[in-house]
Amino acid sequence: EGGVKVIDINTLGVLYVMNNTEKVTVSSFEDLRGKTVYCPAQNPTFLFKAVCEANGLKVGEDIVIDNTYAQPADLRTALASGMVDIAVLPEPMVTIAKSANASLSASIDLTKEWEKHYPENSLMQGCVVVRTQFLEQYPDTVKAFLNEYKASIEFVNANPTVQRRLDKFIGK
C-alpha cells in the first residue's frame, strides 16, 4: 500500500515526565493539575495529551502543554538550568538532564501510563524503514543489513568500553 515498510522496531517507550524536586512535587497525573508542562513538539505532545486525558486531565483547562522548546535538546537545557520546572523528555535527554542537575527526577514513566490505558497498542518510538521498491528489488541486501544491524547492537551491548566511547558522540 505505502512506499515504505517497517523492518525493525528498535525503540519502545522512552518518554518521561521530569520535574525539579526542589520546586514542585510530581508523583501522579493529579499532581499535574493546574500546572504547565513543557513538551517537545509533535509525537511527544500527541502521546502526552492522550495520556493526560486518559488520566482525567483536560488539556487547556486542567493542564497546559507548552511547546516553546520544540526540540528535546533545547527543553533539556531549559529544565536543567531551572527555566522550566516540569517537562516531558525522551532518553537520552533524561539522563543528560539528570547529570546536569541533581534536583531533577523522572517522576512518571509515560510508557507504563500508556500501557495502563492502551494495553492493546505498544508504544513504539523508533523503527527502521525501507522503501518497498528497494526491499522487493534487493531482499538479500536488506536481510544482510538486518543481520549486521543486529550483530552491531549485540556487540555494543556486550562491550561496555565501546558503549562509553559511543556515549561521547550522543552527549551522555
Write out the residue ranges for each language-model feature.
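Acidic/histidine-enriched active-site and ligand-binding environments that engage anionic O-linkages
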Residues: 168-172
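Pocket-lining segment of extracytoplasmic ligand-binding domains
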Residues: 68-167
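Short, glycine-/small- and polar/acidic-enriched structural segments
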Residues: 1-68, 85-91, 107
